[in-house]
Amino acid sequence: AAFDPAVEGVQVKDATYRIYRDTRFSKDKSPYKTWFGVYVCPRGKKSGFSGYYMHVEPDQNHYMLCTGAYCPTAGEIKSVREEIMTEGDAFVEAIEAATGFEVDWSSALKRMPQGWSADDEYSDYYRLRNYILVKMVDKEYFLRPDAIEHAAKDMQCTREFNHSLNRAIEYA
């Protein structure tokens, strides 16, 4: 919250996900999840807003920092696309300012969505279904004594990207 007043006041319970399930009467005592995730965004993880996500999964040696909107609704996607269409330069500048982060193209559409022009300068961004910037990190990143402060410092450069998404999501 130090670098983004929009997430000030978010409680821990509104940013974390449960790991364990009720195993009292089950033979299978394995946890519900084998990873730990924290999602800090305005009004909490269930708000639908874009935010900052930290993922730690030791079993798979999978560690990452993310910023953005994961699984937005159809209306929110349309609103973000309209934001890109009208404020494309600012959107691309926000992505470029996010040093060390890359756009996640893994769930992008193969073709241009219906009703959107492929001739537009920013048309590639219309194909995205999740508007996320990702930074893969290693285990040592989170073993540092100042890991949280370091993660916050890294995510600070993604603030403008988040703000542009949240402007569009709030409008949707």
What role is predicted for each listed range?
Residues 64-114:
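A contiguous pocket-lining binding segment that forms or flanks enzyme active sites
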Residues 2-5, 86, 90, 97, ...:
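A structural signal for alpha-helix termini and helix-coil/disorder junctions
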Residues 1, 104-172:
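Long, solvent-exposed, polar/charged low-complexity segments
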Residues 16, 35, 130:
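A residue-level signal for beta-strand positions that form part of recognition/binding surfaces
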Residues 22-85:
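Aromatic- and glycine-enriched beta-alpha-beta binding-site module
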Residues 1-28:
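Gly/Pro-rich turn-and-neighbor structural signature
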Residues 10, 23-31, 139-142, 149:
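N-terminal low-complexity, intrinsically disordered segments
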